Amino acid sequence: MERFKKASSIIETLKQQGHEAYFVGGSVRDLIIDRPIGDIDIATSALPEEVMAIFPRHVPVGLEHGTVIVVENGEPYEVTTFRTESEYEDFRRPSSVQFVRSLEEDLKRRDFTMNAIAMTEEGERIDLFAGQEAIQKREIVTVGTAADRFQEDALRMMRGIRFVSTLGFSLETKTKQAIETYGHLLEHIAIERITVEFEKLLTGTYCVKGLKELVETKLFSHLPYLQMSEERLLKATQYNWDSFETDIEAWAFFLYCIGEEHPSVFLRQWKFSNKKIKDIVAVLLTIRKRKEKDWDTVLLYKTGIHIAEMAERVYEAMIESYDHTSVERVQTLFQALPIKSRQEMDVTGNDLLNWASKKPGPWVAEMIQKIEEAIVQGNVVNEKECIREWLQECNLL
């Protein structure tokens, strides 16, 4: 409760001004489950302009949705006005938002009962939709009729399966049936929003369970490049996903499991950044080399420690080894390298030009590369004079 205590002054101030205010959403859910608390959100009967008038230190981030960030005790908190939503457009967003003074109306519009629990600053819970019962049963249940919730915002189906992966809960029967029925509506949702949820699924503690639900509900068939991947997705559930430390590793392993032959095309379709695509593809290419041979100094040097560590964890998962010392071995090998990058070489292109008395040309870059590999392989010490002598001995000058 310590983090809630730090934010309770916001609720107390709002109440002193005649408004209702409560902690809501995922933080209350995680407190009940005894999980680490993420962002703490507050819902209030105060209108956005009233919130801004009460708290001088604020950021008006989403006024059209009633959200104001209030900075209290050096921490930012989202304070959102109770609201209800009209008919949804395109199965993804309400055509309009109406601010209301009723907590019940606000909680009624939320996706799942476990996320529709409010809490006072004293810790008293307001649970109008049996969210605590669902948490006790470890079930994911929609607020109201599942068909209505998913037709309002089809992304909720993906969120439901993401919660299976992150919490280890199961989809309640009617909720699961509704996903099977309305899964096609996910095709109306922007891929960027789906990617966010899918990544949380892949990095969840119960990822295998989430992937199984993705297959059982057939929701996968409405995702880009996964329409024909049922058997491959089931293959992914046969592995242990516990060893990964980054989302890059999870995506690389997922692409390996589904046998994706053109990973960069897949990732662009899912709207990844160029940097992320580059890292994921680098991990996959490194694994391909790693399958052919064990690490040597040249492969490790060219790969770099960041990609090498991730590739090794994915490789261990692929061969179902789970030797936790393998990454440590890679780290030890890397630390033993004479140089970690070209910038550490004790010679430059200018040195070569002076020594050879030749005009600049492609030969300079080629020579630098030869010297670089010789240093990494231990054939020459990384000292200017030693390198010059080695070049002369090899008739390269």
UniProtKB/Swiss-Prot annotation:
Cofactor: Mg(2+)
One BP annotation, GO: tRNA 3'-terminal CCA addition
Annotated residues for binding of ATP: G26, R29, R110, D153, R156, R159, R162
Residues given in the record as CTP binding sites: G26, R29, R110, D153, R156, R159, R162
A GO molecular-function descriptor: CCA tRNA nucleotidyltransferase activity
Function: Catalyzes the addition and repair of the essential 3'-terminal CCA sequence in tRNAs without using a nucleic acid template. Adds these three nucleotides in the order of C, C, and A to the tRNA nucleotide-73, using CTP and ATP as substrates and producing inorganic pyrophosphate. tRNA 3'-terminal CCA addition is required both for tRNA processing and repair. Also involved in tRNA surveillance by mediating tandem CCA addition to generate a CCACCA at the 3' terminus of unstable tRNAs. While stable tRNAs receive only 3'-terminal CCA, unstable tRNAs are marked with CCACCA and rapidly degraded.
Entry's family note: Belongs to the tRNA nucleotidyltransferase/poly(A) polymerase family. Bacterial CCA-adding enzyme type 3 subfamily.
Additional facts recorded: A single active site specifically recognizes both ATP and CTP and is responsible for their addition.
Name listed for the protein in its UniProt record: CCA-adding enzyme
